[in-house]
Every structure is written in C-alpha cells, then in structure tokens.
Amino acid sequence: MIIASANDYREAARRRVPPFMFHYADGGSFSERTLARNVSDLADLALRQRVLKDMSQLNTEIELFGEKLAMPIVLAPVGALGMYARRGEVQAAQAAENKGLPFTLSTVSVCPIEEVTPAIKRPMWYQLYVLKDRGFMKSVLERAKAAGCSTLVFTVDMPTPGARYRDLHSGMSGKYKEIRRVLQAMTHPRWAWDVGINGKPHTLGNVSGYTGKSVGLDDYAVWLADNFDPSISWKDLEWIRDFWDGPMVIKGILDVEDAKDAVRFGADGIVVSNHGGRQLDGALSSAKALPSIADAVKGEIKILADSGIRNGLDVVRMIALGADATLIGRAFVYALSAAGRAGVENMLDIFRKEMHVAMTLTSNARISDINRDALVDLTKI
C-alpha cells in the first residue's frame, strides 16, 4: 500500500500484526472517549495562515535538557515494542538516533537496557513506573545510570491499571487468550516469522534481568497489576530525585496544581499527558489541559506534551499551546509494526515535512516563535 502519513501506517500495522497486539496499541480505556477527544480537540484548533514573511531560514531544531533535537519530538516510552517488530526497541532507538531525536525505553520493554544502549551512540531516555518493589526500582535505575541513560521519565498516572475493554475482545487478555493469540499468529505469517519465531525471547527484559526468571507476555499484566503502588505520594519520589543524577521528568500531569507541585518538588520537566487515553476515560485531553498549565509554570520547568499527536501539524499545535516539546507514541508504533526501523525513520521524515509546511504557512521560522497567535479555536467561532 502507499504510505503518505501516520494514518497509512496505522492501516499497514493493522494488516501486519495480530489483532491482540494491534488493538493493545490502538485502544484506550473504558469507552475510549478521552482517546477520541485527544485527537478531536487538536483538530478543533485551526492554524492561522500568515503570508509574505521570509521563511527561507526555517529551523525546527531545539535544545532540551542540554541535548540538541532535530525537531521538538521525543519517542515516547511504549511497552513491549519487541512484540511489534523483531527486537523492536532496538530498531526504534536506532531510527530516533538517525533522525536526531531521543528514544525513551519503557520499564516493560522486551529488549533490556543492556541490549538497546550498545546499539546506539546517542544516550537514550529511560521511563520508570512507581512500583511496590523498591528494590526493582533501585536496581533498574542503577542499570540505566550505568548504561548512560540521560533523562529519567517518571510515569505517575498509573497507580492502578486502566480498564481496557478492547483487550478483552482482541485476545490480549480474557478468556482463552492463549489459543486466540496462536490462531491470530497463524493468520499473520509475516509477523509470526519476524517476531514470533525470530524475535525471541518474548520476555520483559528489564524485569527478567532483576528477578532472574523469565517474565513473559502472559505475565505482563499480572506483574504490572501486582506491582503498581496506589499509596505513592510526592514524598516517595524524593529518594529517586536524590539518586538520579540527570534530568527528571514527571509524566502524567493534567492539573495546574500538580504541575506546581512538580516545580516545588524540583523536577526538571513534566509531560502533560493522559497516557494516550489509556487510563482515566473522561479525563481532559492534553490539548485542553495544556494552556492553563503552561500559563502557570512556563519558564519554571520544561513542559512536554503527548496524547493525540498524529502528524507534524499536531506537534505545531502543542507547541503553540505552550509545550516546549512533544512525545509521540502510537504514530511510531504503527510505523514500527509496518516496516521496522525504516518505517519509523520515514514517519519522522513525514512529521518533519508537515511541520515545515505548518511553520511556513503560519510564518513561524523558529520553534520559539510559535505561540497561541498561530491558533484559532474552531469551537468558539
């Protein structure tokens, strides 16, 4: 099929990977209303076209936490990437590095830290959940430091897992999930060969390295559910702040007061995020939450945003709303699923071209030039 956008990669991914894996990435929680609003609320923001400005020196580069980024995009932490393409975390990290961007490794990755970092020269970011097993948290932080990871992304919006009904329908969870997955793999032979056979081991590499025993896909949801800590508070994060030498980013902020707490805590950055609509259905979209948060803490802390970004125009919209940079998740997972590293690299090229068009036609030659004057809220016209 012809690939022209992230939406095309979504369709290509739907065809290539088994339903239980596709819908795990594609779906949200409960009725998926927040998942839908993440996209629609961005689409409701028209870009204000301005003309006859000199755009010959247009530049998408930024600096973030001492790193140069070719554009204000970071590949977000996504669990089990190695189930979408053979050793998927390695391929995604290499694609990001080749395009001048950071890659964030998830706590629940298939490939462990020690497999991904030797495959790239650029320091990657590492994502950590709040878990009951503090021994695991300390161990994996030590491993991340030893491997040269530059930035810690601390996810705080999962004290309990969201109810993802689509997973019950797809075979990711629920009754007879094992046999359903086998049958699905049989009808997706390219995935079965590339990932199912040649992509082994299918374990949570970072977790298995700590426990000393294999923690596989069937153990994934159980391990997470058993280890999420609903008692967590800001005080519990203090030892992590003291232990980690580099920048620390708090991911999962949707409220102004929480953003202010992050500043008081001493975080270097926040991610305005509703976990891609995968946690609290009914929560604000990131596009709706971002402006008030930016008004409250911009300049005191770096603001990143995710959830709902499907193209380069959406990146420009998030920057205009007050973000310093963005994270993208589903868009690169679709591309990775469809075409591996080459797919992710091509998708990032598409995003860059879309950003160039948007910046040129809104007369913003630098990322720092973009502000809310570039937007028109269609719901208020």
Curated annotation (Swiss-Prot):
The active site is at H275 (proton acceptor). One of its GO terms (biological process) is lactate metabolic process. Its main location: membrane. FMN binds at residues 106, 127, 155, 251, 306-330. GO terms for cellular component: plasma membrane. Keywords: Cell inner membrane, Cell membrane, Flavoprotein, FMN, Membrane, Oxidoreductase. Pfam families: FMN_dh (PF01070). Residues 1-380 form the FMN hydroxy acid dehydrogenase domain. Belongs to the FMN-dependent alpha-hydroxy acid dehydrogenase family. PANTHER family: L-LACTATE DEHYDROGENASE, S -2-HYDROXY-ACID OXIDASE-RELATED. This is L-lactate dehydrogenase. It comes from Haemophilus ducreyi (strain 35000HP / ATCC 700724).
